[in-house]
UniProtKB/Swiss-Prot annotation:
Protein source organism: Trypanosoma equiperdum
Cofactor remark: Binds 1 Mg(2+) ion per subunit.
Annotated binding of Mg(2+), by residue: D108, D151
Transmembrane intervals: 60-80
EC number: 4.6.1.1
Gene from which this protein is expressed: ESAG4C
Protein's name in the database: Receptor-type adenylate cyclase
Ranges of residues in domain Guanylate cyclase: 103-257
Molecular function terms, GO-annotated: adenylate cyclase activity; ATP binding; metal ion binding
Keywords per UniProt: ATP-binding, cAMP biosynthesis, Cell membrane, Glycoprotein, Lyase, Magnesium, Membrane, Metal-binding, Nucleotide-binding, Receptor, Transmembrane, Transmembrane helix
Organism superkingdom: Eukaryota
Amino acid sequence: VDTAEKLSKNGCASNYGATQISVWSMARALNASIPPLTNPMTPSMTFRNSNAGRISGVALVGVIIGGALALFLVVALGVVPYFFLHNTRDNNLAPKELTDPVTLIFTDIESSTALWAAHPELMPDAVATHHRLIRSLIGRYGCYEVKTVGDSFMIASKSPFAAVQLAQELQLCFLHHDWGTNAIDESYQQLEQQRAEEDAKYTPPTARLDLKVYSRLWNGLRVRVGIHTGLCDIRRDEVTKGYDYYGRTSNMAARTESVGNGGQVLMTTAAYMSLSAEEREQIDVTALGDVPLRGVAKPVEMYQLNAVPGRTFAGLRLEHELLNDDEDQTTTSCSDHSSSRTDLSVAAQTIAASLQSLLGTFTPAQRQKALIPFCERWRVPLPQKVGNVWDNDGCQEAIRRVAAKVGRVMDFGTRKASSSVTSLERGGSLFSAGGATVATVASSSNFSCVDGRCGTVQLIDLENDSTTS
């Protein structure tokens, strides 16, 4: 018993609940008449597990793995859906009733093609900031992002006033944002100076402003905005799971945006009159009168929202200016007007001659197939066609439009690279949408950048090259 108690105290023995324990002799085990050596007793022994309170190695590994899985599950069920929903359009905000007027907003960056050519290292971050700022305003004012096309936004709103507030706040946000560079503003001013040199009647609205005055009115990317209100053909896209808006209202909103200048907000009389009298008192507008819009039978009464008091703008970019403008177009419709080759700059004539020489042996269908990527890449309107294939005039018009657009960008890049050069002495390589060089113009070579692509480029001597037409 003493030994048992001793062992029990040392934790080396236990009775596991046994009671009435006695010590028998071997004789007692063989003969029950022989009494036990000790009387039965129940020792005060308790079971004690020496590993109690400790976690084994296997259990520890299991706890670690289980904790990691639990953390992963929290991330998967919480954080991932948050980011997914954050970047997904909220269809609850989409106007869906066919009988309710919808206010549509179109936006576009002024001179984005020229900016990409001049500042390929800055524009990716600038455009990403542009998208982030606009999307934050869409959420703030309960509007709906319909789509983005390049650097253009199409936005729908159930409330006309919310749309107007968004457009006004957009201009203020861009004005007060720290873009981290003055290069974009300098490029806009250079573009205005270039146009003033080409057109004696044109007065640059910002290029000659005092620096302090300029900084109060302008900063960074300039975005033009057009607003129109009306009934729409509303459809849900089964692929994107979002809503889109078709018909006269969307066309009118796009046309309204297209005639504006960067930093300018235009709204049709339909949008303005959709506001209540109290709402109209909260905004500052300037009546612009009737404005002719491409594809619209009658002139449309237009208002300018003075989002940034003190800003002045050039005249509206009306139909006769659209085709030769260096801006990116948000529509793909064609203008009925065209210009002869003599209207093109030297650089544009060089590009046109190169394309004509390169594609001259192609069939009309082959020329159309080759030219469409250029039109899409440089965002120029496609020419009208009869049937499924462009005729010769259509192909020539497509070449002229592409050449006019690329030529203006090259002119801008040349002027920016060397302010002392008064006539175009450099050219560039014309690139396909996939990045392959399609046509290289030949003669004196210089270094230039076109739409963010830099390299040694050459110019064709139109007077000495017998292959040009």
